[in-house]
Curated annotation (Swiss-Prot):
UniProt cross-references to InterPro entries, sorted A to Z: G-protein_beta_WD-40_rep (IPR020472), WD40/YVTN_repeat-like_dom_sf (IPR015943), WD40_repeat_CS (IPR019775), WD40_repeat_dom_sf (IPR036322), WD40_rpt (IPR001680), WDR48 (IPR051246), WDR48/Bun107 (IPR021772)
Organism per entry: Drosophila grimshawi (Hawaiian fruit fly)
WD repeat windows: 26-65, 71-110, 113-152, 164-203, 206-245, 248-287, 290-329, 349-388
Function recorded in the entry: Regulatory component of the Usp12-46 deubiquitylase complex. activates deubiquitination by increasing the catalytic turnover without increasing the affinity of deubiquitinating enzymes for the substrate. The complex deubiquitylates the wg/wingless-signaling receptor arr/arrow, which stabilizes the receptor and increases its concentration at the cell surface; this enhances the sensitivity of cells to wg/wingless-signal stimulation.
Protein name as catalogued: WD repeat-containing protein 48 homolog
Top-level lineage group: Eukaryota
Amino acid sequence: MLTHKTCQARKKMQVSFVIRDAEEKQHRNGVNALQLDPNNGKLYSAGRDAIIRVWNTRTESNEKYIQSMEHHNDWVNDIVLCCNGRNLISASCDTTVKVWNAHKGFCMSTLRTHRDYVQALAYAKDREQVASAGLDKAIFLWDVNTLTALTASNNTVTTSSLTGSKDSIYSLAMNPSGTVIVSGSTENILRIWDPRTCMRSMKLRGHTENVRCLVVSPDGNQVVSGSSDGTIKVWNLGQQRCIQTIHVHKEGVWSLLMSENFQYIISGSRDRNIIVTEIRNPSNKMLVCEEKAPVLSLGYNIDKTGVWATTWNSDIRCWKLPMYDRCILTSGGMDAQWTLGGTEMACIRGGAAIKECTVLNDKRYIITKDSQDKVVVYDVLRVIKKEELGPIEYEKEVMKRNKQVYIPNWFTVDLKTGMPTIVLGQEEVDCFSAWVSIEAGLPECDDPTTEIKINYGKLLLEALLEYWTPPHSIPPNEMEPDVRGNGYFQVPKHTPVIFSEVGGRTVCRLLVRDAAGDSESTLLHETAPQWVTDVVIERNIPKFLKIPFFLQPHPQMTKPERSKKDRLVANEFIQCRKVCEHVLEKVLNTETTPSGGNANNSLQNSQSDANSEGSQLPAEERIELWCNDVVVDPNMDLRTVRHFIWKQSTDLTFQYKAKQNFNFDGK
């Protein structure tokens, strides 16, 4: 017996997985942040599809993809390169901060200090210090050299915290020397700390909405802020006041980039415009470009002649800056004339994000429509893309493929990352509620006359964790074989599987194939909820769901004395032909087989062949079932009849009668 030890015992857990390709070379959703390594021209992009990608900006080829960095399972909100480009720090909506080997692309360690979405990072290059902040109102300071030295045995890290924030923090900035740190929040104010002492030095008021982006001057004397109120403000920290308010956007300002001399601002807005503005003379401005969607992030290209921009869409574009020569953004160039910008210098194409999803009635397939209006069918059970239908009419295809069958919901679909994430749990939707016949597209059993029922949730969990070996501390039972998987199918080995708290933090993320590893096996043993180990390790069978229903003669029956209304209970997936068999054998032959009329009678034992006596015709060709004045298809199961025909909260009621040329004696 597996003794399941878990620190998550009191937490309600869920399991999720992503249906995707083994390698996703394109962003599948918006891109939240950019970082360029000037040493090698590598551009790092933080995606809302939970993936950080690396691009070669020095190549003229359209194929700029180098690699993906995957370990987050929600939006990556911010990234910073540190240690001269050797390492990268990332912040995510999965509430974690991760430390990466930037060159090799693997996650070195995960920091779980935050309790909510981590929205922003700030980096002090001269001190190798990183700050993180998010919706939990907390700001933490990290020593990068300590973070990059963490190992499995040396995994203790200390952090300093900056307290005093009263609302969710959306922006954060530090100067290179690490003498000033500034935060912006939904409190609509800027808070300033000295990170060396963790003491708050001041707060600045002036914005009327959330402060979305911040930049601190290298000397720590000035701060530039962009807000959802549509303004850009320049603050003098020595004077503790706003010295300039710039109105160049019609909607919120979400991204800022400064010239080296801190005299020019490049701003990106929700209004889709990217604009260059001179701080001392805001009327001296020039539109760089109008993007196709709200601008999320900006970053210089390698020679600073252009600016990389990301938006709600998945493309990353580089736009030529409008300037006479590069000195206008470096030395000032007050007398230089603007030249027209807006030329697209390069584009890294992204993929389509799924925007709509419908779960079909069979509760196995889902149909999606993406941002390019392309329709795709996915097989949730096998965790694969089944069919690409192209840009066809979505609603018509859903209607065409939906069958009149009712199977309980056993999973939910999350489209936040732009890819289909399937969620299994035990809360509002029970992942073990879907019992179906083996005919649901799975291999036939050895005996075709045997009716086998399968549980979708059980089969899927067994496939997702097929490579999980129980801990060695469990004494093996030599009398029982080591059973792995579900015996019917396997799922793609590259599938990411995530264990997380319901509505909360991620506890464990791994690929299907990685569950065989010793460390992953131990982690699963510590974190997997009991309802998962019950079916995957203990091989327990989920309980059947039952439906009570009434059975009575149809008014057209020729024997009015048979007016008794029997109440029965059966598994909800029993087909109506079994009810016909019960009527034929247990009700109409009451004189010879006095077993009908029991109020607690179940159909579990009514499995005999209706052809064995009296006629070679099956029961459904001799008995007719009615519900709500509708003849019931004998292939329908009880839950489908209740959902599509009965449509009432009261117990399902059937009426039966003999078909033509058949009497009570079965002749």
